[in-house]
Design a protein with these regions (language model features):
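Terminal and domain-boundary accessory regions
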Residues: 1-208
Length: 208
């Protein structure tokens, strides 16, 4: 009997990953990141989530989003909402935790392992829910920074924690290459379209 293939899905909190890598002095090479986890099993899906503002110009982030979309990532974006709090201060709301959680729960019956690129403690409930469904959860964040960027309750709940510093040699962008754009900026040209995802073609692009 042939060994069972480990089916993996990546769930990337775009801004969280960008901030974590930058705090350690490097930028992510998303091609290398994809290749690294393809080597660990059958990579069924790689989700990338980022909130966007309606008034930001698309040109500043277009290269990154376009590249992700055409190279095996499922890009999910949501427009941020501005509001005024009780003190009269203008604030921006753009949390994508729910979108990530829903996608993970829906995909749970089809995967063996979830790799979560985030240190947000709010994901503890999601991690528990995935584990109850028989999915092994790996959290990738930073514990070596001061202060640590991963919530300790999330780190403890995960089946495995990987400090992103240990992955730097495998997923960091060559400093001589053109730097990646900051994922907080978003393209207004992004359309709600879907195409089949595979290792050489594009992924799924969604705007919420």
């Amino acid at each position: 009997m042939s060994p069972q293939i480990n089916k993996i899905a990546l769930f990337i909190d775009g801004l969280n990953l960008y901030t974590t890598a930058r705090s350690l002095g490097f930028e992510i090479d998303f091609k290398r990141l994809l290749r690294e986890f393809q080597s660990r099993g059958y990579l069924l899906r790689a989700f990338y989530y980022t909130a966007v503002t309606e008034d930001q110009e698309s040109v500043s982030i277009r290269p990154l989003i376009d590249w992700l979309d055409y190279n095996g990532y499922t890009v999910v974006t949501k427009a941020t909402k501005e509001f005024v709090d009780q003190t009269g201060r203008r604030k921006v709301k753009g949390n994508m935790d729910i979108e990530l959680a829903v996608d993970a729960i829906e995909l749970a019956p089809h995967i063996d392992q979830m790799v979560l690129f985030s240190g947000d403690g709010d994901f503890c409930c999601l991690v528990k829910a995935m584990q109850r469904r028989g999915v092994r959860v790996v959290v990738v964040s930073a514990n070596s920074t001061q202060p640590p960027l991963v919530a300790q309750e999330l780190r403890r709940q995960a089946d495995e924690f990987i400090d992103i510093k240990a992955l730097q040699s495998k997923i960091a962008r060559d400093p001589g290459e053109r730097p990646a754009r900051e994922p907080r900026v978003a393209p207004q040209f992004l359309q709600r379209t879907a195409t089949p995802q595979n290792e050489t073609g594009g992924g799924i692009r969604r705007r919420l």
